Amino acid sequence: ERGVPAAEVPPGPQAEEISPAQLAQQLDEPGTVVLDFTTSANFVARHIPGAWWLTRSQLRQALDVIPPAQRYVVTCGSSLLARYAVPEVAALTGKPVQLLTGGTLAWIAAGLPLAHGDSGLAVERRDRYRRPYEGTDNSAEAMQAYLEWEYGLVDQLARDGTHGFRVL
């Protein structure tokens, strides 16, 4: 035996599963909505066309934005985490919920079409840390000037001599 043993995964909720090929056929007809519980970065990079991105913690708010459906299919990269959303989606919608077998990775492996970009974000992307300057209109030069000023504070304090601070 080598390395760290694989972590045991507790059994997830039971879920009716649907294959990527079956889902592709269902998506040709109205009534099916795909809910993708992957990371927002993964979703923006590639997702099933027409899918909606959301997090379980914002499921109720997301369902206010997502058009109602006759049935829902949940996925994530592998569908391991999406499985845990099945009973929650069913309870909140009162509609049948299926789990995509193998997740979005199985969809990709089957050579089925993909969409890219941030259309389909049902909730705000709050699933990752954003640096304070990300998403602002501050130029790189302005950010660099601020950092240089901040790094220069130690020298400025050393020259001042009236403050009583000592650099450790």
Enumerate the language-model features and the residues they cover.
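Rhodanese-like catalytic fold shared by cysteine-dependent sulfurtransferases
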Residues: 1-33, 37-168
